[in-house]
Amino acid sequence: MRYTIGLSAHKESTMQSHELNTRIISRGKEFFAAIAGEKPSLFDKGAWMGKVMDWCMQNDQFKIRMFRFVDVFPSLTTSRLLTEHVREYFGKEQEMPAFMATGAKMAGMLGSLGGAVLNRLLTSNIEEMARQFIIGENTREAVKNLERQRRDGFAAVVDVLGEATLSEEEAESYTTTYLELLEALKQEQASWHGLPGSGGDPDLDWGHAPKVNVAVKPTALFCLANPQDFEGSVTAILDRLRRIFLKVRELNGFLCIDMESYRHKEITLEVFRRLKLEHPDYPSLGIALQAYLRDTDRDLDSLLVWAEQHGVQISIRLVKGAYWDFETVRARQNGWEIPVWTIKAESDAAFERQARKILEHHRICHFACASHNIRTVSAVLELAKALQVPEERYEFQVLYGMAEPVRKGILRVAGRIRLYSPYGSMVPGMGYLVRRLLENTANESFLRRSFAGDAGIEQLLEDPVVTAERERAARAARPKKERTGPGGLSPFRNEAMVDFTRLGHRDAFPAHIARVRSLLGRTYPLYVGGREVATNDLLPSVNPNRPSEVVGQVCLADTKEVADAIAAARDAFPAWRDTDPRTRAEYLLKAAGAARGRIFELAAWQILEIGKQWDQAYADVAEAIDFLEYYAREMIRLGEPRRIGHSPGELNHYFYEPRGVAAVIAPWNFPLAISMGMVSAAIVTGNSVVFKPSGLTPVIGWQLVELFREAGLPAGVFNYIPGRSSVMGDFLVDHPDISLIAFTGSVETGLRIIERAAKVHPGQANVKRVVAEMGGKNAIIIDDDADLDEAVPHVLMSAFGFQGQKCSACSRIIVLDAVYGRFIERLVAMARATRVGPAEDPGCYLGAVADEQAQQKINDYIALGKREGGVLFESQLPEGEGYFVPMTIIGGIRPEHRIAREEIFGPVLAIMRVNDFDQALQWANSTRFALTGGVFSRSPEHLAKARREFRVGNLYLNRNITGALVERQPFGGAGMSGGGTKAGGPDYLLHFMDPRVTTENTMRRGFAPVEADDDWVE
């Protein structure tokens, strides 16, 4: 009986849904009929912009070049730069529209005069393009255009352009701009008549709505907004947002908190909730939600329940979302679930579903429908009618400069429409402009399909649920790209990065830090031949941020214990060498699984023992897992003998075998990742290992013992022997049974190892091989057209992440003269906003350095830098204990200065000023190191030149230069940075093995078996 009732109710619901959809389609057809023959100005081919849009829709490659050119355009401040970039971006005349071809030709014929003509032409047209979407560059322009809009019957939401500011000065400027705009609107709104509506207060728009309505982007209010520091970000954003809100309230206006990238979604929701509870009786405070996010159904339900519980009125502006490409790419790069719907119709269906939910709760939630989609607008109108929603509880919004026929149509049928009107200068407006251009030229854009495509009205008005189901079915029917890894394993994928948008990840760090802290102070033995070995010589390991806190103490090996470990490894080697490569790989995969299950705990050990920040510590563990997973697959691939040569009558096989006992000497800065990388490479290739961890991170080194023990690795294959380098270092390197040495550390130590390994000792049967990764003096070039919004935070991250204690860290910035002043101003301002303090505090950007010796060395280099150049910035240090040094930026440095040549391994950045890009490359290549480097440029020719001439092992273009990922960015350099090996790359394991060849004569009495790939004479 219950089933029958349920079925009946479902049938009735389906019928109602069908009837509603019929009404939506009918209204949509009426809408299209009312605007027949009209076209948005964007698609008017008689105008410059319309021609450009038409070219973009016809040619994807031109679209990419055009939008990138628009992005770089504000930085092209001279005729020379402009002419060069037109040539670089568009090249041949037949590849560009006529106006550009004419201008380029004129520039070529007339030299600087032609360049000036081209400059004026492009400037005029691109500024016209920007004005299409931006209501004004200053308050006067904005107010004038707002008044014009109101005369046409349109209200407005004003948004100051800018997001993700880089400094507190920029955040304060953004806040001040809002306050000044609001003050100007306060003077003007008194003269504005309320837009006509169905009764109510004539001094309000439509009788019920504030005339002043602004939208604010939270990330513009705090330059270091970051979900890792969730509470600090929320608090800092609110500090400035309150000032804007109080000014809005003074005007009896409306404030909407914009939703930006998914990364900041939870911060934005929390900011809204807190501000609303501070002013529970003020109704004109809202938040934007993005229908294309998979979380939005849940977030909407949560907000509505929260509003009910607290008895407050809220307002929601529902948008589709404008960062689809960014969110998709970022999620894939980091190994996260994609947060957005991947089928356009799914976003449309979600919008209608969420619109219904809001309209059903109109008693507590005002609704702003922000869409140009006629199907969506028709659905909202019909839903509101069916649910008997009062007119004052919902309105419509469209973007300024877009979809003029749609906004006029909405004005006719609903009367309540706002234009979302960005305001500000062209430079921050370029990002917004490019997003709008992408939106309008996308194949799935409703406006393009409606006004510049051939989609029929029935297709445009189809129920998006039906469209999405059809697309999902079509995707399911397509042939799947089956990818398998070596030996039938799944393909290698990097371990997902920590996702601080997830509450579980944010909460995991304090919990695991507390748990690990409860385990501090233990004593750790040696691990030799599968047995724990205690010694009386103990070394305490301390927290560099709190040296009085002992993380643990380890037993130290003397030469006797080292000899015992080498003997255990030597005895284990024959059986391990003969173990099938697949079986050896399985041990690595088991260790990877064990590490994955303890990933937050292992990160917590790094936070406390070596002072890594939360994200840095997690990334170190993830990289260790990557090495295990990747090298396991690589050994399976390399473990199969490969036939070489195809001459009939013989079989030649090429294969590899291990070298013997490997000494692995690890650094402290990546105590799990690099240690695991070198150890796992040696083990999986069939060598047995004697592992010496750094004396600064021996407790983390012990974690390798636990992981391999959990994996069931045979006794003697892995041996753990912490000890003083002065006591055991040379003994380990010189020992005749050592066949291979894997080392990561300083140049001085690396060269000493290479020198000693070259000497043959009595009883030695192998020429020792050294796999050494040493130091770097890495440079980033800032070109004269660089995007400083990108360059500044990436430079800061590259130079000061983990206190600059990475061999890949940036220690030199080479800046072209044309942008020097602007770059330095913004870099110093962002550095000034950071905080120095304990690494376990997520609000601290810079923590303590490794130990007192490192502290003294870095301070000595800072003093040297002050003598060789001039200090541009030096941070304040926290009070109390800890090996802290200031974040320091030193200007006026040249290639001959020691500060530009010697590796410091700390948060000290040298700034070098050059005239042109060629000089920048020359200076970048002027050291004896060749590890990493970077270039920030939007010149295709300069990027190509850097690829050819910037001679480093890892070159990064338009991104930070640290954080190389296994497989994607195999890591290692040449010169004095190393021997050219690439950790995490396809040839790294070869350095741990010797190649062998077997040749068999298959001819017997004149008969030879035929192999499938033999080269026979036809």
State what each model feature region is.
Residues 707-712, 734-735, 740, 749-894, ...:
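ALDH superfamily catalytic-core signature
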Residues 443, 452-551:
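Hydrophobic face of amphipathic alpha-helices that form TPR/SEL1-like repeat modules
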Residues 2-11:
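Short, positively charged and aromatic/hydrophobic N-terminal segments
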Residues 547-639:
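Glycine-rich loop-to-alpha-helix module at the N-terminal edge of alpha/beta enzyme cores
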Residues 393-396, 438-448, 545-554, 571, ...:
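Conserved C-terminal structural/oligomerization subdomain of aldehyde/semialdehyde dehydrogenase
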Residues 12-494:
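Positively charged, amphipathic and often flexible ligand-engagement surfaces
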Residues 530, 548-549, 569, 584, ...:
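Residue-level signal for inorganic ion chemistry
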Residues 607, 637-790, 914, 980:
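Rossmann-like NAD(P) dinucleotide-binding subdomain of oxidoreductase/dehydrogenase enzymes
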